């Protein structure tokens, strides 16, 4: 009996380990043959049968590293490699898309087999096409002395997939002209390769040949034609063929429904589903996933729940292919509790499932839960995380202003090569910008080879949010000079920068040139930004005139921006008008009550102020609770108004009382509308006081405080005063921008 003895595992020092399909650092075949290191495998015979069986086994298990090393040992032992072994090896190279290995193997095959069969050469051809190396495939195709339907189908499909349609059509026409009758399987393969609108004409030609060949009754080909027309964007043709099908297979149904959904016709997809249910068409799990996506795009919660009931009845909700779309559906319908329940039913959640639930936490503003889930999953099964998951965590960290965790996640993503696309890098820029780490944001941006418009816009927005208006405008000009065309969101960022710096003329110029110079039509959002610029600058009459003359009816945000300016500049008359308009357009927005209340109390109109509070109570509205937080030694400390739950509460209030003697000085005057005791309880003051008692060293880092709402004027003055008295730099990020307090001054110059 032949025995194969394996002494030890193969040494990774001899042949680089293949870790993924993108591996390209592969030694030449000559270096493999000339290796002088001691063999790790000893072969006890030269008959070759067992050796080839072992080689086939390694190939089928996709262990190319070990297979190549074993080939070296077979060479040393004088054992030849069979054609079947080569076929299996090329199949492994094809599936792993390892072009470098495939080329080495092809060179070796040429040396070892004088006249390879057409079957073996087709394996090589398929490998080159799958690895998207048409140059190698073309060369081999021309060299082949014998061609069959598989050879031609492989090349035609490869040309079609890569958009080289003239060659695909030419080869297909030549095959027909030669009298060869294509097998039905060839049509199915060709139809799968036509995946974009440019291939539609070629697809119609194939459809015509199918009709001439009398293959219209072939269900697989009919399904292929339906899906081909969907992928090429001709839904009318797809529906026409679908309606003529005698037997409507689920694959054809789902293909058409996917086409409808992707084309923004989700309601047509649902109608098709309902019609086919009535006809008694059988369904599989993929059909349900497509229907749920259509329901999600329309936010059809009730219909989606009915689909869920069908899924549960069939026992499919534990399957990841159905459970994940269910989770996504409920999240998009803002039914997060149902999404969590659906997630818990999935037997083995995959990376898409986890990404969906973490993204759901972010959409529901449960950012801490998103980070907590990510950390837990990372420690248990890091391999299940994908680039979308990391992008969601970057978003969560940007809202939480947690630069420490954000930096750790960033490092982990780099280590695992999961930063992903430029979208992920743009999310990083936003995260670092909103955490107040512009140097890190700049480093990410500068590391990008060709930043797209999303990255440019994120970087400009970061500087606008930070209060660096001049830098934001400089970046905009640089972006344009690089040939990048700004989009609607880019102009929002530029106008925001102008607003935060009181740059009225620059804002007007930006709005005027949007359409004229850059062919970007301004929307109501851009006009609202301009209203904000006027209002912040105290140009309330100009703002009102602008609102009357703009091509849109003022919306709730228009009046909210105007009302905010009225409060900042204490214009009660215009503030009353703005408040009334805002309450009419959006009666649920508390700003329409709180800002007029502040104006009335400032003016001493107590009855009118009480009326505002009465309206809020009648409509069961509550002002959003102010919350501020600060990081110390990696831990986040949160404070709300009047907070007394912090372990260091006594020290915090004692620190605040140290400034009590200055509260009646010339620099800091409390508004008449609030008592001094109430001001002491404001969340940002509590956070600042905690920061002061936590600082260490002679040159401590700035005290960074983050707040969910706009900083109140009194606390803004308080922070300026503290920075002067203590010498500490204080940074506050509120809902609008960053404030840098140093030596009694703020970077915003009171534009906020």
From Swiss-Prot:
Q: Where exactly is the transit peptide annotated in this entry?
A: 1-80
| GO CC terms | chloroplast
Molecular function (GO) terms listed? mRNA binding; zinc ion binding
The protein's UniProt keywords, in alphabetical order, are: Chloroplast, Plastid, Repeat, Transit peptide
Quick one: a GO biological-process term for this protein? RNA modification
Q: Where are the PPR repeats?
A: 47-81, 82-116, 117-147, 148-182, 183-217, 218-248, 249-283, 284-318, 319-349, 350-384, 386-420, 421-451, 452-486, 487-522, 523-553
Q: Where in the cell is it found?
A: Plastid, Chloroplast
**Type DYW motif: where is this region?**
665-752
Residue numbers spanned by region Type E(+) motif: 634-664
InterPro entries in the cross-refs: DYW_dom, E_motif, Eplus_motif, Pentatricopeptide_rpt, PPR_At4g14850-like_plant, TPR-like_helical_dom_sf
* Record Gene3D superfamilies: Tetratricopeptide repeat domain (1.25.40.10)
Residues of the region (Type E motif) are: 558-633
Just give the chief location class: plastid
Q: Does the keyword Transit peptide apply?
A: yes
Give the UniProt family note. Answer: Belongs to the PPR family. PCMP-H subfamily.
Its recorded name reads Pentatricopeptide repeat-containing protein At5g13270, chloroplastic
Source organism of the structure: Arabidopsis thaliana (Mouse-ear cress)
């Amino acid at each position: 009996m032949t025995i194969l003895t394996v002494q030890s595992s193969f040494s990774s020092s001899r042949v680089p380990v293949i870790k993924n399909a993108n591996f390209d650092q592969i030694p030449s075949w000559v270096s493999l043959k000339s290796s002088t290191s001691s063999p790790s495998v000893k072969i006890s015979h030269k008959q070759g049968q067992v050796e080839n069986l072992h080689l086939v086994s390694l190939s089928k298990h996709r262990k190319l590293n070990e297979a190549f090393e074993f080939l070296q040992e077979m060479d040393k032992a004088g054992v030849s490699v069979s054609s079947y072994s080569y076929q299996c090896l090329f199949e492994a190279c094809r599936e792993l898309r390892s072009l470098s290995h495939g080329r080495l193997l092809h060179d070796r095959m040429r040396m070892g087999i004088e006249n390879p069969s057409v079957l073996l050469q087709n394996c090589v051809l398929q490998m080159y096409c799958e690895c998207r190396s048409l140059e190698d495939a073309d060369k081999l195709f021309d060299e082949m002395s014998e061609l069959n339907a598989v050879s031609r189908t492989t090349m035609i499909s490869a040309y079609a997939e890569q958009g080289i349609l003239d060659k695909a059509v030419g080869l297909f026409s030549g095959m027909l002209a030669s009298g060869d009758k294509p097998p039905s399987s060839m049509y199915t393969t060709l139809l799968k390769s036509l995946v974009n609108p440019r291939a539609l004409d070629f697809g119609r030609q194939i459809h015509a040949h199918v009709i001439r060949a009398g293959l219209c009754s072939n269900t697989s080909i009919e399904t292929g034609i339906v899906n081909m027309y969907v992928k090429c964007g001709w839904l009318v043709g797809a529906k026409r063929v679908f309606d003529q099908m005698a037997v409507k297979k689920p694959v054809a149904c789902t293909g058409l429904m996917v086409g409808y959904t992707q084309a923004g016709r989700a309601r047509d997809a649902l109608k098709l589903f309902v019609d086919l249910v009535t006809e008694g068409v059988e369904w599989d799990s993929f059909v349900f996933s497509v229907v749920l996506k259509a329901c999600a795009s329309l936010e059809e919660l009730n219909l989606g729940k009915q689909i869920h009931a069908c899924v549960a009845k069939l026992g499919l909700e534990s399957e990841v292919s159905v459970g994940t779309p269910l989770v996504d559906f409920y999240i998009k319908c803002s039914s997060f509790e149902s999404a969590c329940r659906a997630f818990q039913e999935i037997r083995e959640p995959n990376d898409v499932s986890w990404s969906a639930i973490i993204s759901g936490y972010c959409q529901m503003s449960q950012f801490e839960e998103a980070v907590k889930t990510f950390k837990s999953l990372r420690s248990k099964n890091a391999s299940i995380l994908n680039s979308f998951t990391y992008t969601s965590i970057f978003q969560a960290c940007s809202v939480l202003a947690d630069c420490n965790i954000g930096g750790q996640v960033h490092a982990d993503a780099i280590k695992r090569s999961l930063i992903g696309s430029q979208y992920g890098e743009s999310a990083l820029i936003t995260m670092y910008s909103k955490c107040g780490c512009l140097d890190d944001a700049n480093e990410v941006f500068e590391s990008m080879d060709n930043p797209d418009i999303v990255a440019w816009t994120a970087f400009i927005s970061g500087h606008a949010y930070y209060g660096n208006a001049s830098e934001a405008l400089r970046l905009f000009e640089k972006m344009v000079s690089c040939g990048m065309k700004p989009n609607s969101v880019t102009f929002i960022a530029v106008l925001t920068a102008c607003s935060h710096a009181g740059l009225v003329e620059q804002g007007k110029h930006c709005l005027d040139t949007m359409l004229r110079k850059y062919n970007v039509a301004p929307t109501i959002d851009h006009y609202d930004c301009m209203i904000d610029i006027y209002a912040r600058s105290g140009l309330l009459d100009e703002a009102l005139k602008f609102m009357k003359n703009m091509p849109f009816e003022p919306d709730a945000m228009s009046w909210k921006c105007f009302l905010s300016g009225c409060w900042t500049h204490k214009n009660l008359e215009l503030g009353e008008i703005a408040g009334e308009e805002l309450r009419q357009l959006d009666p649920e927005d508390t700003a329409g009550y709180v800002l007029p209340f502040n104006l009335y109390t400032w003016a001493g109109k107590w009855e009118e102020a009480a009326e505002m509070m009465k309206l809020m109570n009648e409509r069961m509205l509550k002002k959003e609770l102010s919350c501020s937080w600060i990081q110390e030694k990696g831990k986040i400390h949160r404070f709300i108004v009047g907070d007394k739950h912090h372990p260091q509460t006594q020290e915090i209030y004692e620190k605040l009382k140290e400034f009590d003697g200055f509260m009646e000085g010339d620099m800091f005057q409390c508004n008449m509308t609030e008592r001094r005791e109430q001001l002491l309880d404001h969340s940002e003051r509590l956070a600042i006081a905690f920061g002061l008692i936590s600082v260490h060293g002679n040159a401590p880092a700035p005290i960074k405080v983050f707040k969910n709402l706009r900083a109140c004027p009194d606390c803004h003055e308080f922070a300026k005063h503290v920075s002067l008295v203590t010498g500490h730099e204080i940074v506050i990020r509120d809902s609008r921008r960053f404030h840098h307090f140093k030596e009694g001054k703020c970077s915003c110059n009171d534009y906020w």
